[in-house]
């Protein structure tokens, strides 16, 4: 069987020889071969079948390659052409076999073969027929994919067939919509004839001489072959068409002479010169030229020229007569001198070209215009115009010849330059190849010499130690990852017999090496085996990314993967992959290219009117001129590509998606893509750390850094996740490669999974503009075009990485494939969501650099899934400009200019909704109010809404509510509101920006401290809820106007004024800071003025307003979350001082953000928004901004010091000298005072506890909690008879670099003092008896430092429930029910449950009194309840899990969990034992026999839900939906447990009513934040 050399066998013989070899080796482990020695002796050896077949395949491909190169039809010698040639030859062999079958009287088989479908194939002039008999759908699709790949590489055109059934399936009847596949289109056809014709029409450039083997773009051929001959033929026709000459006798005659005739004509000529700024010049402006005066002059015109007497023959006389005949023209195409001016004038008059056209364009115009000279002559004859011998036709021909010669020279010069450039490039390529070959030859020679020397040394060592024992094994030892990949490949692709053969091959290799260690045959055999081994495993590792071959060694190193614990890991150490490095360089280059110049920005929000004209923005700078596409015919179209199929992605494999644009926008001139919207649905289980990296690139650029657009990394959760990627590029649909420009590169990674597993599905859409007119790009417009012209067809995108526009006239291929290599993650994940930065998924237990797994995004390129719009700094009332002075190092100062700039910032904040500080105004300043005006959809000026005059009582307790005003209700009041506020009655959409001005005049030395807070839901009706919200102090000790601005929150930040009575819009609450002024002669009045600022947006609903600012809090409920800077208010406490207070008295403030506001003597605590957030975690890290407000009389003065002691130290035993060594802040005051400063967070373990520890002593109060120490330096001092009582309020107004870690168990929110009995402080916990809890009487204990009213709820002890499926939601009672078959429940899906809503006397929202068996039992221990109830609005994706409580084996555990989402109140909330619930059309899932639980995803809506729901008629809009639960009635099924957990980002906006927790055990108290030292 051995074939020596290249045998001249035909293709059929080669195939037969190969098939015979495989048939002979089938079923054998070894096969004998003959070896011919140098002396002619023949030796027979037994070799493994695997090695024999490898040798056969190598010989087989070598013979086929020789035949392919020798084929005269072969034009391109490369690997892809060889694969296609081999495909066609095999088809030809199949046809030959069919022919032989017919010759051998096997007509039946041939007929069956034809009936199965003989597909025509044409390749280089040959036609083949390929049978599809026995092909399955998988093989047909694979063949189509291979044909499309070949067509893409070679430039073929293929036709896709819409068939749905193969002929071989034998189906005679087809259902509706199915099309049977004809035999000619079962596989895609490749038209070689069209390819050959297009190659002939291409330029005659030598393809083989180019440095690369790609095809050249086709260039139009010049029509220089038949152009001159055509013109000469036309001239010959005109010569032949002359009138026949009349034979006249030749005699000389005299022509009569004629005198010339002249006439005078009066004309007007404009004055072209004028004096401009003292200088004489010629203006170029057409408007100024038309304004210049004209002057008159007399011109002489020659009517008839002088004709002298000429002696000529009679023939000439006849010619002159014919020439003067107006009815007959004769063309004399002789050599005539024609001026260029006359030629241009003639061309313009004929309407053929313009003055500004180039020579090549003029030639194209002449060649495309059907110039009919006879028609022109006839027209002139009809006009009866006398013409000289130099006719117009001759001039036109002369001009045409000159222009053609000029254009031909230009084209020839261009071709010569292009050919020279290609020649130089080819020479440079050859020189580079030669240099690389020389270097490679030197390197290989050096390596050979080193290998020879090493082999010689090793042979000497082996020869010396041959008697000592067997020779060592010097075979190739594969690395760990190579062995793993090879085993996986062998298990999939090899049969058991083949695996056994391969194993025997390696054993025989080792035996032969030991048996004949010193022979050359053994050495060659070992080397050959090592080479084959390396090649085989190189192919197995790189099978997915390299072409299938057995003779090509892998050139790139294997990818780095993580090995299991305890196994050896081979390969290179972890380094940055080439794909990651290229993408990182691309991002850095894109930022540098698109960085705005001085004084301009490419992504600047609008500073002028927000909605100046029908929702269009005008805030572009000059650097964005290339995106300012102006359409000539004003054709504007909002583009949204939605008809895109859903694509599936597999784990660990990068997939590139080219977004087609020509199919829908092929008739548009230009296309501006602003944003790319993607929706990703995860297919993995919740909790698995899996991420998806999505890179968007523009393939029309040469380098990745030029075409890089964005890179986004998403963590895959449950349900659909939507994300918007700003792009901002302009493409041209007429470009032939437009469907391959915009590219999505998607890569999934994370926890190690099996390659090929489906992990996610993706759906994308585009948002932008399409222009039908020809676009133009200009920096400015002419003055004449700006008159009465509105530019309404330009839209500004606020975000986006604007890339320079690129065209592809000279491009051969789009941007090459860029791989994003990665390494799997392990351990817990860490979520990063900074407002102005990036999003990344990092590893918690991995020593390698986590930035190599996924690339961190800069802020200039894109935003992540939860990043907010890059808006300016938030309007925070606690941010002031701080100045330095010698007396006090930290004195707050107010700057009117800075406050005005921050107040006018549009959109507010990305994290905080926005509150601003107050600006002081002089009492003598008279304010001028102008009549406002409205234009379009935005207010141009501030408008006044209403005015209130509030009487201030002379005495008021601390936190007493004085007044509450509903902003929209007061604005819509026809009695008290202003005229302008009545305009809001016809407004459907409103995005308000309120400004409230407070004016209060107090006597000297008096002070009336007031607090103001914005209540979004109107639920802040207790003292603790008002203090825990973001309030502001109004301290008026003299004439001062305080300004308070706020942007109300809502479901979408867009409000409706007509819904003000329903509670949408919020309330303005004014409450007291505690004061007493009994000596006033008359009550004081507080004047409140409400206005709408000019950046308020409103509309009628015809045009949608842009989405407003994002939620003030957004994060994922993971084990660790990085929130960055968060503007969140936490009330720490307040203390009282008076003149008799002890000098040096100390008070401690424990900064435990999760402790809440402790009141009623430690028997109750209120969890606001900040405490609810911190209660979800055990540790926090970062710094915070502390604000201290002193409420004092104007005649009172004093000073305190605030120290920062280290955590874990007993601050009680610090002396004053030791305290002065700590960081401290001095706060003196005279009258009212305020200060804010930043406190750095530090701990000996790097983290602080969010809650106080359970058992602590007086010596170690703070442990790991942050704390403050307040020392009274000077007690409050005042004049005799005055009040010296003051109150100091401590609040945290901002957190910086905040990171939360280690999710906490919610039942351990509070801790007690040592030796006190610990009791579960939470309610609504399911007990086994399922009975109503009994209320207990409470003992009200007033805190001397904080007197608050009693807001208590009943408490009982409870059991701890499991958290296997997330947070506990509710328990639904089952059991027996006479005459009923099913238990049916309807529960509102809301996370804002409160104790007074579903406490001991209510169930759900039906207000039904409880009996002995409680049917529905909600749980307030759910962390979502705690967090979402503290906010005004929330939005989150929820995963509900239903677990059956009962005996599954005895009864059929049938349970249905469904979702009802309809505004029709078809079902009421509560319990029913007779009705039949159905969630058809929505989401539903059922639980059958043998299953223990069922899950249901409830997606979030496009608007936020209210945290507190009071109106049952609006549950559809204020909840996510209604949950339906249905299960069988049986004594074995006691009930069902319902769990819930978030599966995506949690968004919370506004301050709502938090949870108020009370205690009943006398031995248990809560540790307050502020206490007095022992």
Curated annotation (Swiss-Prot):
Signal sequence region: none
Decide whether keyword Coiled coil is in the record: yes
Q: Which residues form a coiled coil?
A: 361-422
Q: What keywords appear on the UniProt entry?
A: Capsid protein, Coiled coil, Host cell junction, Transport, Viral movement protein, Virion
Quote the SUPFAM superfamilies the UniProt record gives. Positive stranded ssRNA viruses (SSF88633)
Question: Record's GO cellular component, any one?
Answer: viral capsid
User: Which InterPro entries does the record match to this protein?
Assistant: Nepo_coat_N, Viral_coat
Asked if the keyword Manganese belongs to this entry, the reply reads no
- PTM comment text: Specific enzymatic cleavages by RNA1 encoded picornain 3C-like protease in vivo yield mature proteins.
Query: What would be one Pfam family of this protein?
Result: Nepo_coat_N
Site residues, Cleavage: 913-914, 1357-1358
Region Disordered: start and end of each range?
Answer: 557-579, 863-916
Q: Name one GO biological process term.
A: transport of virus in host, cell to cell
Biological function: Capsid proteins form a capsid enclosing the viral positive strand RNA genome. Together they form an icosahedral capsid pseudo T=3 with a diameter of approximately 30 nm (Potential).
What is this protein's record name? RNA2 polyprotein
| Organism whose genome encodes this protein | Satsuma dwarf virus (isolate Satsuma mandarin/Japan/S-58/1977)
């Amino acid at each position: 069987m051995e074939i020596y050399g290249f045998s001249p066998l035909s293709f059929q013989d080669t195939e037969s020889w190969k098939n015979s070899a495989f048939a002979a080796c089938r079923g054998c482990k070894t096969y004998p071969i003959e070896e011919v020695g140098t002396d002619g002796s023949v030796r027979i050896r037994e070799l493994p079948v695997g090695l024999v077949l490898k040798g056969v395949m190598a010989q087989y491909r070598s013979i086929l390659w020789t035949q392919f190169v020798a084929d005269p039809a072969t034009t391109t010698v490369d690997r892809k052409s060889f694969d296609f040639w081999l495909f066609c030859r095999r088809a030809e062999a199949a046809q030959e076999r069919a022919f032989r079958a017919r010759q051998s009287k096997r007509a039946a088989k041939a007929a069956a073969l034809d009936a199965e479908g003989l597909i025509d194939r044409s390749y280089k002039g040959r036609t083949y027929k390929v049978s599809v008999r026995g092909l399955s759908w998988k093989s047909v699709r694979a063949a189509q994919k291979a044909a499309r790949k070949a067509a893409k590489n070679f430039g073929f055109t293929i036709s896709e067939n819409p068939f749905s059934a193969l002929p071989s399936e034998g189906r005679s009847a087809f259902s509706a919509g199915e099309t049977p596949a004809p035999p000619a289109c079962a596989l895609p056809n490749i038209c070689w004839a069209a390819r050959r014709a297009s190659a002939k029409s291409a330029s005659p450039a030598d393809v083989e001489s180019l440095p690369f083997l790609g095809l050249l773009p086709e260039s139009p051929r010049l029509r220089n072959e038949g152009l001159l001959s055509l013109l000469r033929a036309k001239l010959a026709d005109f010569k032949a068409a002359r009138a026949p000459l009349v034979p006249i006798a030749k005699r000389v005659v005299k022509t009569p002479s004629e005198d010339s005739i002249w006439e005078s004509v009066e004309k007007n000529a404009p004055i072209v010169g004028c004096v401009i700024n003292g200088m004489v010049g010629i203006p170029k402006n057409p408007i100024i030229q038309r304004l210049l005066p004209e002057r008159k002059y007399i011109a002489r015109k020659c009517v008839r020229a002088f004709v002298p007497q000429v002696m000529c023959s009679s023939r000439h006389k006849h010619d002159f007569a014919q020439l003067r005949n107006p009815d007959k023209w004769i063309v004399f195409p002789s050599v005539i001198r024609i001026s260029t001016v006359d030629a241009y004038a003639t061309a313009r008059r004929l309407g053929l070209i313009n003055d500004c056209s180039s020579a090549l364009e003029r030639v194209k115009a002449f060649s495309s215009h059907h110039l009919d000279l006879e028609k022109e002559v006839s027209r002139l004859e009809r006009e009866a115009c006398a013409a000289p011998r130099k006719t117009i036709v001759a001039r036109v021909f002369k001009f045409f010849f000159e222009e053609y010669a000029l254009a031909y020279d230009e084209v020839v010069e261009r071709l010569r330059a292009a050919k020279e450039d290609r020649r130089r490039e080819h020479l440079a390529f050859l020189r580079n190849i030669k240099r690389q070959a020389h270097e490679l030859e030197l390197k290989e020679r050096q390596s050979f010499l080193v290998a020879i020397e090493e082999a010689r040394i090793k042979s000497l060592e082996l020869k010396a130690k041959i008697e000592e024992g067997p020779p060592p094994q010097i075979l190739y030892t594969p690395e760990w990852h190579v062995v793993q990949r090879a085993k996986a490949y062998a298990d999939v692709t090899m049969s058991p017999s083949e695996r056994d053969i391969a194993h025997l091959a390696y054993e025989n290799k080792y035996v032969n090496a030991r048996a004949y260690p010193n022979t050359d045959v053994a050495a060659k055999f070992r080397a050959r085996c090592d080479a084959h081994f390396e090649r085989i495993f190189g192919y197995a590792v790189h099978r997915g990314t390299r072409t299938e071959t057995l003779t090509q060694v892998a050139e790139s190193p294997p990818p780095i993967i993580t090995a299991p614990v305890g196994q050896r890991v081979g390969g290179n150490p972890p380094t940055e992959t080439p794909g990651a490095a290229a993408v990182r360089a691309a991002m850095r280059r894109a930022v540098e290219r698109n960085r705005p110049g001085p004084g301009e920005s490419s992504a600047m929000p609008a500073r002028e009117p927000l909605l100046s004209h029908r929702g269009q923005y005008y805030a572009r700078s000059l650097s964005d001129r290339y995106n300012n596409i102006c359409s000539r015919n004003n054709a504007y179209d909002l583009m949204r590509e939605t008809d895109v199929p859903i694509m599936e992605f597999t784990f660990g494999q990068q997939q590139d998606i080219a977004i087609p644009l020509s199919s829908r926008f092929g008739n548009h001139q230009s296309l501006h893509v602003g944003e790319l919207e993607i929706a990703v649905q995860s297919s993995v289980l919740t909790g698995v750390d899996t991420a998806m990296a999505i890179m968007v690139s523009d393939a029309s650029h040469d380098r990745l850094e030029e075409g890089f657009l964005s890179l986004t990394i998403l963590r895959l959760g449950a349900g659909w996740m939507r994300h918007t990627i700003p792009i901002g590029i302009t493409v041209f649909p007429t470009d032939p490669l437009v469907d391959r420009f915009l590219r999505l590169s998607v890569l999934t990674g994370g926890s190690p999974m099996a390659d090929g597993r489906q992990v996610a599905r993706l759906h994308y859409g585009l948002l932008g503009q399409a222009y039908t007119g020809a676009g133009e790009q200009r920096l400015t417009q002419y003055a004449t075009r700006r008159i009465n012209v509105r530019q309404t067809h330009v839209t500004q995108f606020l975000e986006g990485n604007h890339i320079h526009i690129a065209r592809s006239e000279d491009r051969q291929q789009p941007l090459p494939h860029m791989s994003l290599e990665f390494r799997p993650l392990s351990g817990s994940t860490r979520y990063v969501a900074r407002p102005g930065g990036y999003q990344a998924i990092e590893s918690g237990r991995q020593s390698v650099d986590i930035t190599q797994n996924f690339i961190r995004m800069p802020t200039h390129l894109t935003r992540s899934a939860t990043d907010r719009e890059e808006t300016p700094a938030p309007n925070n009332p606690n941010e002031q400009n701080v100045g330095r002075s010698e007396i006090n190092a930290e004195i707050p100062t107010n700057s009117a200019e800075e406050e005005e700039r921050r107040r006018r910032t549009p959109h507010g904040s990305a994290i905080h909704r926005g509150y601003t500080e107050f600006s002081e105004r002089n009492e003598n300043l008279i304010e001028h109010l102008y009549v406002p005006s409205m234009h379009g959809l935005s207010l141009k000026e501030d408008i006044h809404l209403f005015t209130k005059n509030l009487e201030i009582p002379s005495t008021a307790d601390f936190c007493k509510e004085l007044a509450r005003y509903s902003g929209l209700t007061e604005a819509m009041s026809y009695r008290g509101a202003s005229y302008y506020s009545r305009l809001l009655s016809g407004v459907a959409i409103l995005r308000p920006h309120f400004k409230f001005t407070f004016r209060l005049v107090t006597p000297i030395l008096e002070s009336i401290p007031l607090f103001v807070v914005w209540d979004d839901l109107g639920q802040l009706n207790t003292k603790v809820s008002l203090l825990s919200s973001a309030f502001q102090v109004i301290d008026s000790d003299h004439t001062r106007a305080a300004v308070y601005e706020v942007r109300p929150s809502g479901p979408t930040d867009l409000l409706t004024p007509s819904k003000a009575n329903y509670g949408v819009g919020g309330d303005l609450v004014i409450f007291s800071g505690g004061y007493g002024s009994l000596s006033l002669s008359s009550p004081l009045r507080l004047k409140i003025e409400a206005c709408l600022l000019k950046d308020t947006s409103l509309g009628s609903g015809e045009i949608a307003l842009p989405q407003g600012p994002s939620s003030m809090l957004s994060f994922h409920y993971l084990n660790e979350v990085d929130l960055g800077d968060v503007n969140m208010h936490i009330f720490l406490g307040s203390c009282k001082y008076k003149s008799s207070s002890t000098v040096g008295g100390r008070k401690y403030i424990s900064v435990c953000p999760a402790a809440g506001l402790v009141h009623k003597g430690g028997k109750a605590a209120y969890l606001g928004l900040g405490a609810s957030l911190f209660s979800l975690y055990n540790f926090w890290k970062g710094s915070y901004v502390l604000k201290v407000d002193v409420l004092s009389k104007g005649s009172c003065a004093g000073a305190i010091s605030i120290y920062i002691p280290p955590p874990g130290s007993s601050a009680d035993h610090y002396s004053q000298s030791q305290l002065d060594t700590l960081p401290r802040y001095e706060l003196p005051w005279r009258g009212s005072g305020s200060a804010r400063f930043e406190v750095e967070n530090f701990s000996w373990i790097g983290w602080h506890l969010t809650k106080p520890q359970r058992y602590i002593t007086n010596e170690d109060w703070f442990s790991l909690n942050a704390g403050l120490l307040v020392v009274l330096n000077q007690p409050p001092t005042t004049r005799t008879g005055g009040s010296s009582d003051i109150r100091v309020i401590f609040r945290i107004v901002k957190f910086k670099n905040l990171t939360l870690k280690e999710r906490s168990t919610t039942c351990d929110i509070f801790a007690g003092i040592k030796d006190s009995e610990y009791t579960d402080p939470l309610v609504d916990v399911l007990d086994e008896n399922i009975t109503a809890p009994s209320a207990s009487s409470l003992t009200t204990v007033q805190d001397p430092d904080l007197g608050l009213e009693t807001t208590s709820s009943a408490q009982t002890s409870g059991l701890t429930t499991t958290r296997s499926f997330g947070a506990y939601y509710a328990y639904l009672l089952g059991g027996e029910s006479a005459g009923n078959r099913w238990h049916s429940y309807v529960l509102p899906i809301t996370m804002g449950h409160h104790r007074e809503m579903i406490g001991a006397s209510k169930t759900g929202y039906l207000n039904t009194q409880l009996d002995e068996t409680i049917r529905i039992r909600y749980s307030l221990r759910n962390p979502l309840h705690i967090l979402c109830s503290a906010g005004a609005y929330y939005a989150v994706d929820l995963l509900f899990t239903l677990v059956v409580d009962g005996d599954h084996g005895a009864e059929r555990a049938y349970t249905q969990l469904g979702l009802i989402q309809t505004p029709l109140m078809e079902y009421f909330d509560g319990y029913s034992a007779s009705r039949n619930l159905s969630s058809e059309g929505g989401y539903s899932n059922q639980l059958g026999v043998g299953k223990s639980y069922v899950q249901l995803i409830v997606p979030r809506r496009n608007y936020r839900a209210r945290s507190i729901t009071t109106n049952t008629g609006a549950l559809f809009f204020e909840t996510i939906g209604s949950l339906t639960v249905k299960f069988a009635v049986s004594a074995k099924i006691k009930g069902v447990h319902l769990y819930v957990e978030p599966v995506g980002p949690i968004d919370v906006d506004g301050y709502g009513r938090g949870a108020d927790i009370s205690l009943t055990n006398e031995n248990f108290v809560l540790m307050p934040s502020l206490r007095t030292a022992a």
